[in-house]
Amino acid sequence: MGKNFHHPYQPYDIQTQLMEHIYELLNSGKKVGIFESPTGTGKTLSLICSTVTWLREHKLEKLNSKVDNDNLSDSTFSSSDDEPEWVNQFYNDKIMKEKSKSLQEYENYLEGLSMSNIKPVLRQLDIGDRKRKKTVPRHIEIEIEDDETNFLPEPYEQDSVSNQNDYEKGQINDEIQKLLAKIDKGYDVKTENNMELKSPLKIYFSSRTHSQLTQFASQLTLPSFPPSSPTLEKERIKFLPLASRKQLCIHAKVSKLKSDLINDACVETVKRQECQFYTNSRDLISSKQFRDYTFSEISDIEDLVQLGHSLHVCPYYSSRTALEGAEIVTLPYQHILSFEIRESLGINLKDSIVIIDEAHNLMDTITSIYSCEISLSDIKICKKLMKIYLNKFKRKLNGKNRVNIMKLMKLLDILQAFIESHFEKGKEISPQSMFRDSNADLLNIHELVTYMRGSKIAYKIDSYADSKLKSDESNTNSVKQPILFKISKFVLSLSNPSFEGSFFFEEGMIIKYMLLEPNQIFKTIVNDSKCVILAGGTMQPTSEFIENLLPFVPSKDIVQFSCNHIIPESNLDTFIVSEGFNFNYESRNNESVMCKLYDFLLELGCRVPHGIVVFFPSYGYLEHVIKFWQLEEIFEKLSMNKRIFYETPGGSDILPQYSSTILDKKKGAFLFSVVGGKLSEGINFQDNLARAVVMVGLPYPNLYSSELLVKKRHIEQKVISAGGSLKDAKSATIEFYENICMKAVNQSIGRAIRHANDYACIYLVDNRYLNNKVQHKLSEWVRKRVKSELKTSEIFAQTSVFFASNR
């Protein structure tokens, strides 16, 4: 009998295999695990059961170790060999009971809170009428007025130690977080002396969306784990969902601000002692109440917001206080990937387990977070706003502020002139070239960055502009995103190390900074934590992670495992439709190829019941094919067989109509989608919604896009600088290009099977899928079921047999 992972159901073999591999990774001391578990195979529960089982066992070992260490340091205890073994054991048991007593009392207390059906009670409580002893007096909340003095720059000292430290710790796009550092570090609530209630080793679970984190919380309620102490009858999981101020703020006015402004507005409000929620959350009794209510049952972010309202405390700051005792913490990507956010929240990854779910897009996410851009239009708007601000406040600004604002305007003038005179799409540029032909010798980027951080001038100008736009009801040119923050972020990027990223011109008169070395950001996470688990439904090709994200991790410290699917072998067939099909750039617009695709889909529609999802490589090609079929007057015939829905860029959501057609019409429907579009990721095409998934061609990205050209040059330079040949460099860029394509293929066709009883066929329509290298980069559960070297007629025949046997 294998290891008991306390799975709430009888796990499938592949779930057991995944849990065993994760558990072995944690026991082995290796640093990184890359795990692929197809959607619908219970990946989340497998992650929970394996990691929490290990965590509880590890805590028990730590507790026993702590007892032994305490015994050795106890002067009343003799470790002499003359002491009978039963005496030693009796003493150990006594110490264990004493240390477990407080844990049991706390568990009993939490059980009482849980049994009291706390949520309805909290909603009815009138906290204002409750008489409780407060160690910190409550402040009467003062509404933030549009007092014009609030828009003046914050006092700062240009050469102060604090400003210098802020600059040195600055990251690529973390200006906002650095502005919060002072107030965040000043947040100091007294902690309990009871060390047993703390949980130094934690599981941090991060995913892309709020809904995915909420789903994790709901799954966490299903299993039941043994306690970490043998004397405990039961031990509930101490779970804490961390979130941003935008999600947790309950201040009436601050919570309504744009996400780019809310962080600084929070700092401003706290500094002026105008947020009673923050003041109350500094109180020991209130912060403990928030923690205990949170730990009494599995709570999501909405529960924390409700709890904050009920207890009249700030959920954001109170959740940070609860962090110390949490065993499992969920948080969005940005919170785990940004060093500055981790620092401000008090997140210490030392010896902890970091799980990054939906990790197939991890590198793209890191690149996106740490990249920025400004357009010529942004610069012009920013200059206009700064002039309005100067005209309004020039008499109230001191000399230093006026000088620094004028320097910022000078910087904008230089950038505007540079874009207007040097723009060439795709051209890489250096920060030095931006200032080479200007009299920028009087500008010091370091000093400007320090000034912007210390004075919060970006927040001041943006919030003043926002207030004026709101007061002018006739103004229709409201800026959707605070412009000064974009400028501020770009100025910060000018001081980044050149090897980490690159500046280049993008279409639309834009200067873009793009991070090129995401491994530099990820390295601190891997080094600090005990172990990092990268999990996803489609992680192939994993070479992308190993070469570009984890080059600093020795191969012996990386574990890889790819699950098969839980469905029977007979529930999925994968066909390579190669006969006469090649959708490369040279031939895909040939009329014969588009006609052949039409014939294939027409016949397929007669043999596949219900829904068929067809993925095209781009919106442009989808539109081109449909127009051709319409001109040939054959499109209508295809739609007579099955109704056709097709995705358009920026178009309305067609999924509800498609779904209702599948439910209402026996003949079913086609859904023409685009790889990388809204329907290619995150949407479940289960059961009749996708009895077949068709991939038209290989969706290689545009090789001549500015971003891809910059990345290509960077990869080539890296290979050559490491001693590689031109041939090696070329090979590396081809590998990079293929990985982007195959990652997109896997994401799209992974929509086909969503649960154990689902069934479908996958059709890879292009003779290039016969290439072994291409097939090797398919997800393993798809690759194992590939049927190649079949004629189209044989594919249709086997399709009919497949659906006849699966009715």
Curated annotation (Swiss-Prot):
Q: Which GO terms describe its biological process?
A: DNA damage response; establishment of sister chromatid cohesion; nucleobase-containing compound metabolic process
Superkingdom of this protein's organism = Eukaryota
Where in this chain does the entry annotate a coiled-coil region? none
Q: Where is this motif: DEAH box?
A: 357-360
Q: Which InterPro entries match?
A: ATP-dep_Helicase_C (IPR006555), DinG/Rad3-like (IPR045028), DNA/RNA_helicase_DEAH_CS (IPR002464), Helic_SF1/SF2_ATP-bd_DinG/Rad3 (IPR014013), Helicase-like_DEXD_c2 (IPR006554), P-loop_NTPase (IPR027417), RAD3-like_helicase_DEAD (IPR010614), Rad3/Chl1-like (IPR013020)
What is the top EC class of this enzyme, as a single word? Answer: isomerase
Q: Which cofactor does it need?
A: [4Fe-4S] cluster
Q: Which N-terminal stretch is annotated as signal sequence?
A: none
Output the Pfam families linked to this UniProt entry. DEAD_2, Helicase_C_2
* Residues annotated for ATP binding in this entry: 37-44
Q: Report the GO terms under cellular component.
A: nucleus
CDD domains (alphabetical): SF2_C_XPD
| Cofactor note text | Binds 1 [4Fe-4S] cluster.
Q: What is its EC number?
A: 5.6.2.3
> Which terms does the record give in the GO molecular function aspect?
ATP binding; ATP hydrolysis activity; DNA binding; DNA helicase activity; iron-sulfur cluster binding; metal ion binding
Chief subcellular location equals nucleus
List of residues binding [4Fe-4S] cluster: 249, 266, 275, 314
Which stretches make up the Helicase ATP-binding domain?
1-415
The record's subcellular locations are: Nucleus
Keywords for this protein: ATP-binding, Cell cycle, DNA-binding, Helicase, Hydrolase, Iron, Iron-sulfur, Isomerase, Metal-binding, Nucleotide-binding, Nucleus
Q: Which reaction does it catalyse?
A: Couples ATP hydrolysis with the unwinding of duplex DNA at the replication fork by translocating in the 5'-3' direction. This creates two antiparallel DNA single strands (ssDNA). The leading ssDNA polymer is the template for DNA polymerase III holoenzyme which synthesizes a continuous strand; ATP + H2O = ADP + phosphate + H(+)
Q: What does this protein do?
A: ATP-dependent DNA helicase important for chromosome transmission and normal cell cycle progression in G(2)/M. May have a role in changing DNA topology to allow the loading of proteins involved in maintaining sister chromatid cohesion in the vicinity of the centromeres. Has a specific role in chromosome segregation during meiosis II.
List the NCBIfam families hit by this protein, alphabetically.
rad3 (TIGR00604)
Q: Which family does it belong to?
A: Belongs to the DEAD box helicase family. DEAH subfamily. DDX11/CHL1 sub-subfamily.
Enumerate the PANTHER family for this protein: ATP-DEPENDENT DNA HELICASE DDX11-RELATED (PTHR11472:SF41), DNA REPAIR DEAD HELICASE RAD3/XP-D SUBFAMILY MEMBER (PTHR11472)
Q: What is this protein called?
A: ATP-dependent DNA helicase CHL1
Q: Species name for this entry?
A: Kluyveromyces lactis (strain ATCC 8585 / CBS 2359 / DSM 70799 / NBRC 1267 / NRRL Y-1140 / WM37) (Yeast)
Its organism's taxonomic lineage begins at: Eukaryota, Fungi, Dikarya, Ascomycota, Saccharomycotina
